[in-house]
């Protein structure tokens, strides 16, 4: 019974000691004045950021929609390019993607060699056998 009382008292003492240590402002890494200054600085920064964000959104909209201001005269370079290559000659991005994917598909489906597999083993074994003349399709040298 005495042992339980000592253990409970010791645990209670450690808990109270930890709570009191945390409550003491001396153990805080920052003073309340520093925290107040930091808070006001953060509020000012958020206000400035909010004002700048409104201006940036308008600029982004203006850049994204140049047609809203009206048709602009193109540079001589652009006009020369349009005269040489009309817009109908340009391929759409999807057409380029489809041609690339069909080329890749053809490459994957193409046989590795025109001779083909002998059917005895897999193509890898046939290649090893043809190099060592010990496979199904290899000729024996005697």
From Swiss-Prot:
The answer on whether this UniProt entry bears the keyword rRNA processing reads no
Q: Chief localization class?
A: secreted
Q: Where is this region: Disordered?
A: 47-123
Source domain of life: Eukaryota
Spell out the Basic and acidic residues composition-biased ranges. 77-94
As given in the record, the signal peptide range reads 1-23
* Biological process terms in GO annotation: blood vessel diameter maintenance; cGMP biosynthetic process; cGMP-mediated signaling; negative regulation of systemic arterial blood pressure; neuropeptide signaling pathway; receptor guanylyl cyclase signaling pathway
Post-translational changes noted in the entry: Cleaved upon secretion to produce the functional hormone.
Q: Where in the cell is it found?
A: Secreted
Spell out the InterPro entries in the cross-references.
Answer: Natr_peptide, Natr_peptide_CS, Natriuretic_peptide, Natriuretic_peptide_brain
PANTHER family the record matches: ATRIAL NATRIURETIC FACTOR PRECURSOR, NATRIURETIC PEPTIDES B
Similarity field:
Belongs to the natriuretic peptide family.
The protein's name is: Natriuretic peptides A
Gene that this sequence comes from: nppa
């Amino acid at each position: 019974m005495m042992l339980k009382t000592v253990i409970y008292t010791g645990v209670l003492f450690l808990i109270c000691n930890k709570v009191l240590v945390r409550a003491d402002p001396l153990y805080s890494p920052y003073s309340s004045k520093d925290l107040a200054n930091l808070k006001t600085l953060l509020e000012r920064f958020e206000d400035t950021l909010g004002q700048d964000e409104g201006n940036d959104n308008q600029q982004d909209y203006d850049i994204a929609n140049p047609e809203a201001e009206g048709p602009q005269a193109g540079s001589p370079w652009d006009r020369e390019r349009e005269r040489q290559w009309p817009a109908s000659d340009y391929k759409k991005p999807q057409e380029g993607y489809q041609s690339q994917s069909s080329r890749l598909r053809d490459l994957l489906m193409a046989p590795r060699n025109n001779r083909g597999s002998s059917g005895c083993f897999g193509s890898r074994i046939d290649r090893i056998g043809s190099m060592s003349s010990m496979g199904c399709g290899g000729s024996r040298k005697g």
